[in-house]
Amino acid sequence: MPEIFRFYGFSFFFYSREHEPLHIHVEGNDGMAKFDLVEDEFVLKIVHNIKSNDLKKIKEVIDCNKDIIIKHWIKYFGKED
């Protein structure tokens, strides 16, 4: 499970045997979320047990680090989508 980074007590990562589309998982504080890259923007697809204020921070971190996430995906999986 390649972890890309940690912020606010949350881990941002991919699973080793991922599938398309390009996406990122977030886990921490007994919650989880998944964001898919849709038309050049990460969109929330799944969320469980994450407070709305934490979700807002997570989305900001993802938006500010979008290029890093995409580069890590391409490096690990070999393609963008």
Give a label for each model feature.
Residues 4, 43-46, 65:
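Generic preference for hydrophobic/aromatic residues in regular secondary structure cores
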Residues 10-15, 35, 73-77:
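Aromatic side chains
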Residues 15-52:
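A short, structured beta-strand/loop element
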Residues 53-81:
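C-terminal structural segments of small proteins and small subunits
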Residues 1-12:
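Negatively charged, low-complexity tracts enriched in Asp/Glu with abundant Ser/Thr
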